[in-house]
From Swiss-Prot:
Domain notes from UniProt: Intact N-terminus is essential for virion morphogenesis. Possesses two apical sorting signals, one in the ectodomain, which is likely to be a glycan, and the other in the transmembrane domain. The transmembrane domain also plays a role in lipid raft association.
Top-level taxonomy: Viruses, Riboviria, Orthornavirae, Negarnaviricota, Polyploviricotina
Other facts noted in the record for this chain: The influenza A genome consist of 8 RNA segments. Genetic variation of hemagglutinin and/or neuraminidase genes results in the emergence of new influenza strains. The mechanism of variation can be the result of point mutations or the result of genetic reassortment between segments of two different strains.
Top-level EC class: hydrolase
Originating gene: NA
Intravirion-side segments: 1-15
Region (Involved in apical transport and lipid raft association): 11-33
Source organism (scientific name): Influenza A virus (strain A/Shearwater/Australia/1972 H6N5)
Segments on the Virion surface side according to the record's topology features: 37-468
Protein name (Swiss-Prot/TrEMBL): Neuraminidase
Amino acid sequence: MNPNQKIITIGSASLGLVIFNILLHVASITLGIISVTKDNKVHICNTTEVYNETVRVETVVIPVNNTIYLNHEPEFLNNTEPLCDVSGFAIVSKDNGIRIGSRGHIFVIREPFVSCGPSECRTFFLTQGALLNDKHSNNTVKDRSPYRALMSVPLGSSPNAYQAKFESVGWSATACHDGKKWMAIGVSGADDDAYAVIHYGGVPTDVIRSWRKQILRTQESSCVCIKGECYWVMTDGPANNQASYKIFKSQKGMVVDEKEISFQGGHIEECSCYPNMGKVECVCRDNWNGMNRPILIFDEKLEYEVGYLCAGIPTDTPRVQDSSFTGSCTNAVGRSGTNNYGVKGFGFRQGNSVWAGRTISVSSRSGFEVLLIEDGWIRPSKTISKKVEVLNNKNWSGYSGAFTIPTAMTSKNCIVPCFWLEMIRGKPEERTSIWTSSSSTVFCGVSSEVPGWSWDDGAILPFDIDKM
C-alpha cells in the first residue's frame, strides 16, 4: 500500500468513527425524551450520589507596597554647642550684585546680612524699593524711607528681582531660624514713633513699639535661636548720646520676655551676635564714645554681662593708630561726639583670644582685615598672632557682621563661625553716582590657615543713569 492509499484509509476510518459518535448522541437524546414523556409521576429520590471532585488550589501572590510616608516634624535647633576653634576664614560666596546690576534687575540695597537654618543659609538685605540703573535709585543714600523692605535670596545669589523673597517692611531688621521656621523682624515708621513687626513662618505674629520715641532700631544681622527660643538686641535713643538698650526673647514669633540693659556711659548699637555653649555673645557698635567695641553676653534667663572688648587693638572706625590705643574691658576708649560715629562690626571669642574684623583705613570705610588677638577677650593685649586681608585699602568696604552654621547642617560637634562683609558703592564716597547700594562677600571659619586676597566689588562706575 503506497502512502497516499494509507492516508485515504486512515481518513475514511476517522470519518466513520465521527459519524458513529454522532448517531450514539442522537439515540441517547431520543431515549431520554421518550422516558420523560412516558412517566409524568413525581419520584422521590432516596439515593445518595457521591461526586468525587478534585479541586485545584492555586496560591496567587500579589505584591503590596507597604511603604508609609510620615511627615517628619522638624526639631528646634540646639545651638548649645561650643563655637569651633578656627585657624582662618575661607571665602564662601560673593554676590557681585553691583556689577550684575548695570544691566540686570538688581535691587538697590544696604545692610545685607546672612543667617542659616538647619538646611540652608540665606542672604537678607534692606531694599530701597528701586532697581539699580533706574531713576528711582536717586537719593537712596537715605537710611529710612517708607519704600524700604527686608528681603532675602539664597546665599551667593545677587539681590535680584526674580529670586528675592519678601520678609518684612522695614529700614532696620534682623532674622533667624529656630529649626522649624524663619523669624524676620522689620522696623518701620516715623523716627519718633517707629515699631517692629515680627514675622514667623511668613505670618505677622507680634509687634514691638518704640519705648523712647527716638528711632527704634535693631541689629542689621542675624538674631540667635537656642532650643526654640530666639534672642535679639534693640536700641532706642540718640545715636551720639546715652540711649536705651533691650534684649528680647521670643517663642514662635511671640515676645515672651525682655530686659533693659543698664550701661551708663556706654553705647550699644547694631550688635553682631552668635551662640556659644548655650549663651549668646554679641560684639556691638559704640556710636557715641568708643573706638573699642561693646561686648554683651546673656543666657536664656536674660541675665547679662556688659562691657567692652578688652583688646589693646581698636576695631571700630574711625580710630587712632594701634600704637596710640589703650584698651579697656569696662569703659569706652576714644573721643566723644559725632566725629566718632563708628561702623557695624563683629568679633568671635576663641577661648581667651578673639577674632575681630576691621577696616584697613583708620578714618574711612575702606579695605578690610581679620585679626586674631591673643588674650584679647580678657585683657588689653596688643599681640596679633594672625592677620588676613580680604579687601585691599583701594576699595570701599562697609558694615560687617557675624553668623554661624549650626551642627544640623555640618554634622560637626561645634558651631562654625562666619562673617559677611558689605562693600558700599555710589554715594557718599563716589559722588558721580546718584544712588547708594552694596554687594557682599561671605567667609567661614576653617581648621587651616588660608591666604588673603582682595575680593573687591569690581563694578565700573558711573552707570548710565548717572550720566543723564
